Amino acid sequence: MNRKVLDELRWDDGYAIPVANAENKTLEEEMQKKEKEKIQLSNQVKGFEERIQAMADHLRNVRQELTYTQSLVRARENETESEEHFKTLSEREIGRLKQEIQRLENELVSLREKKNSHENNIFKTTQKLENLKRQLNWDQQTLEAWLEESARKDEDSMAIQKYSQKDDGKIKELSLLIEKLTLEAGQKRKLMDNELTETITAQIELDKTAEDFRKAHTERQQLISQWESTIGQMQKRDRDIDHCAMLLAQVKQELREKESIIKEKIQFLQSEIDNNKEYEKKISAAERQAAKLRLELQEQEIIRGRLQDELDSLKGVVDRTASDLETMRTEVTSLKKDIRNRQNRLQMAQEYNDGLSDKLNFVTESALSLEERALRMEEMFKEQEKTVKDLEVQLKQIREILFKKSQELHECKAKEKDVIAEINGGQVTLKNLNSQLQKLDSHALKQQGIMYNQDFQIQQLERRLSRLKGEVNTDEKQALEMRVSQLTKVFEERRAALKLLNTQHKKLQGDVRYIKRELEKTGQEKGDLISKKEEFNLFNMMSEKTLKKIKASKQDLMVEDNILKLEIKRLRDMLYSKADDVFSLEKRKLQLQTAMKERTEEISVHKEMLKSHIRYVDQERQNISSQLHERLAKVEKMRKRFEILTIAMMPPEGEEEKSQAYYVVKAAQEKEELQRVGDDLDGKIRKAEKEIRALENTLRVINGCNTSFKKSFSKITETSEEYDEKVQLEEEKKAAEEKHRYKQRQIRELQEDTQVMKNTFDSMINEELSYQEKAKELLPAITQLNKETEDQKQKLERVLKQYSKLSKHVRNAKKSKEETQEEKDINVRDLRDFNQSLNKMLAQAMEKNPDLATALQLYFHQFGLEIPTIGSTPGSYSSRSSSSRSSTISVRSGTSRISVNSGQSPRIKVVDLGLPPACPSSNVSSARSSRTSSRSGSSKSQKQE
C-alpha cells in the first residue's frame, strides 16, 4: 500500500520513506489521550444532561403533585368550611326552634290561664244564674203573699218586672260573653293547630334538607376519595417513571463506558493487526528462503484440493443464504401486507372517528335537554371505550406479531452473521492461500530459472570442455538429448499444471466476485430490512404515543364525565326537588282555587240562606212583637174590662161581697197563665236571638276567612315574612338558572374542546401520512446522497493524504515544523468558503421557512453578526491556481452540496438549523478537528490496507 502511494507521488527511490519523528509520535499520543479525555468528558456531559433532564422531569412531577395536593387541601378546607357553615346553620335552626317551642309553651300557658279564668267566670255566672233561679223559685206561699202585696202595690210589681227584665238582659249578656269566649277559644285552638301543622311541615322540610345534605356530603367524600386514589396512582406512576429514568441514565452511562472500552479494544485490535501483518511479512520472507519446493508444491496441491472442497461448501452456504434471503423477502412482503392491513384499520378508525364527530355535531346542533345530552355523552363514551378496547386488542395482536417477526429477524440476523463470519473466514483463508500460492509460484519459477541457468551453464561448460578436449561422445550426447527431452516433457507438464492452476485461480476469483456481489446484495437487503424495521419501530412508537395520548385524554374525559355526571345528578336532584315543590305548590294552588270556588259557592249559598233566614227571623220577630203588643193591648183591655166588670159586678148593697182572696186567686191564675204564655214566647224569642247570633258569628267567621283569602291574593309588603321567603326563592331560582347556564356553557366548551382535539388529531394523522410519503419520496434521494457522501469521503481521504504528504514535504523543504504561510492561506480560504456556503444554506433555509428568521436574527444580533442573504453571499467556488486547492475546494463544495441537499430534507434541516450560530473561531476549530479526524481516519485506512 505504501509502495502504491509512493508510486502515485512518483517518489524517488533514492530518498528514504518519511516516518513520524519522536515529537510527532508524542503529539499523536497526546492527541489520542486528549481524544479519550474528550470522549470521557462528552460521556460525563451526556450523563449530567440526562441527570438534569431527569431531575427537571422529577421537579415537574413534584410540582404537579404539589398542585394536586394543594387542590386536595383546598377541597378539604372547603368541605370543613361547608360543614362548619351547615353546623352553624343547624345550631341557629335548633336555637330558633327552641325559641319557637318556648314561645308556644308560653302561649299554651297563657291560653290555659285564660281558659281557667274563663271557666271561673262561667262558673261564677252559672252560680249567679242558679242564685237567680233560686230567688225566682219561690214557694207558693211567698208567691201568694207577694201577690197580695203586689195586688196592693202595682208599682212594686212593675219595679220587680223591670228588675227581672234587667236581670234577663244581664243573663243574656253573660251568655253572649260565654259564647264569644268559646268562639275565641276555638279560634285559638285552630291557630294552635295551624302552628302545629306548620312546625311539622318545617320539621319535615328540615329532615329532607338534612338528608339531601348528607347525600351531597357522602357524594363529595366519594369524589374526594376517588380524586385521592387517582392522585396516588399518578404519584406511583411518576415514581415509576423517575425510577425508569434513573435506570435509563445508568444504562446509558454503562453503554457509553462500554463503547469507550470497545473503541479502545478496536484500536488495540488494529494495532495488533498491524503488528501481525508485519510479522506475517517477516514470516513470508523467511518462508521464501525455505527449501524443498517440490514437497511444498505437493502440499499446496493438496491444500488446493481442500480449498476446492471448501469453495464448494461455501457455494452451498451461499445457496442457503440465498434461500434464507428469499424467505426473508417473503416475510417482508407479509410485513408489507400487515402494514396495508394496519393502514386499512387506521382508515376505518378514522372513518369511525368521523362518524363519532358527526354524532357529536348532531348532538350539539340538536336542542336537547341536559339529561338527553348526558345520555348521548354516556352512549358516545361507551362506544369510544369499545373502540379503544378493540384498538387495544388489535395493538396487542400487532405487538405479538411484531415480537414474533422481530424474533425471526433476530434469528435471521444471527444466521446472517454466522454466514458472513464463515464467508469472511473463507475469504481470509482464500486470500492467504492465494498469496502463499503466488509466493510459491514465484519462488518455484525463480528456482526453476536458477536451475535452468545452472544446467545451461553446466552444459555450456561441458561443451567447452569437450571442445577443448576435442572429444565428442555419442553416448553422452544421446544421454544429453534424452535428458533434454525429459526436461522438455517436465517443462510441458509444469506448464500444463500452471495453466490448470491459472484457470482454477480465475474460476476461484470469479466465484469470489460472485460471492462478494451476493454479499453486497444481502447487505443492501439487510439495510433495507433494518430501515423497514426502524420504520416499524417508529410506527409502533408513534402508535404507542398516540395510544398513551388517547388513554390520557380518555382518563381526562372520564374524570370530566364523572364530574359532569355528578353535577348533572346534583342539578337533576335540585330540579326534581324544585319540580316537586313547584308541583306541590301548583297542586296546592289548584286545591286552594277549587276550595276557594267551592267555599265561595258555599258562602254565597250560606249567605242567601242566612239572608232568607234573617228575613224569616225578622218577620217572626215582627210577628212576635206585634203579637206581644196585641197581647199587651188585650191585657190592658182585659184589665180595664176587669175593672169595669169588678165595678159592674160589685154586689148591690145588701148582698155579701165575694172575698178578695177569690179575686186574687183568680187574678193570680190568669196571671200565671199569661206568665206561662209569655215565658213560652220569651223562650222562642231567645232561641231565635241565639240562632241569629250564631248565624252572625258564622257570617263573621266567613267574612274573616274571605278577608284572609283576599289578603293572600293581595300584594305582599316588603316587611312581611312571605316577602322575604319570596325574595329567597327568587334568588335561589336565579342561582339555579345561572348554574344551569354555566353548566351549558361548560358543556359547549367541552364539546368545542373535543372537536378541536379531534381536528388536531386528524391534522396530526394527515401530517404523519404526508411525512411518511415525504420520507418514502426522499429515501432514494437519501441513498443517492449517501453514495455521493461515500464517494466524496473517499475523494476527501485521498486529497487529505496528498495534502498531508505535500505539507510534510513543503515543511521538510523549508525545514520548519509549524504551519507555513501557504497552509494558513489555504485554511483561511477554506474557512471563508465554508462560511459562505453556510450563509447561503441559512439564507435558503430562511427563504423556505420564514419562521426561522426571527430566531436567527436573535442569534446573529447576540454575536454582532449580519444576517446572510442570497444576494449578499457571493459564489464560493472561484477558480484556484494550484491542483491541491482545486481538489480541496471540490471536496468542500461537495460537502456543502451535501449539507444543502440535506438541508432540503426536513430531518437534517431541523438538525442543522437547530444549532446556535458559531463564531469564526469555533468554525476554525471545527474545521481543524474535522481535518484531524479525517487525517486519523485516512492513516487508519492506510494501516489496514
From Swiss-Prot:
Q: Which domain of life is it from?
A: Eukaryota
Q: Subcellular location, in the record's words?
A: Cytoplasm, Cytoskeleton, Cilium axoneme
User: For this chain's UniProt record, which GO biological process terms are given?
Assistant: axonemal dynein complex assembly; cilium-dependent cell motility; epithelial cilium movement involved in determination of left/right asymmetry; inner dynein arm assembly
Keywords per UniProt = Cell projection, Cilium, Coiled coil, Cytoplasm, Cytoskeleton
* Coiled-coil stretches: 16-535, 584-604, 666-826
Biased composition range(s): Low complexity:
871-899, 921-945
Disulphide-bonded residues? none
Which Pfam family, any one, appears in the UniProt record?
A: CCDC39
User: Would you name any one GO CC term?
Assistant: axoneme
Q: What does this protein do?
A: Required for assembly of dynein regulatory complex (DRC) and inner dynein arm (IDA) complexes, which are responsible for ciliary beat regulation, thereby playing a central role in motility in cilia and flagella. Probably acts together with ccdc40 to form a molecular ruler that determines the 96 nanometer (nm) repeat length and arrangements of components in cilia and flagella. Not required for outer dynein arm complexes assembly.
PANTHER family associated with the record:
COILED-COIL DOMAIN-CONTAINING PROTEIN 39
Protein name from the UniProt record? Coiled-coil domain-containing protein 39
Lineage of the organism: Eukaryota, Metazoa, Chordata, Craniata, Vertebrata
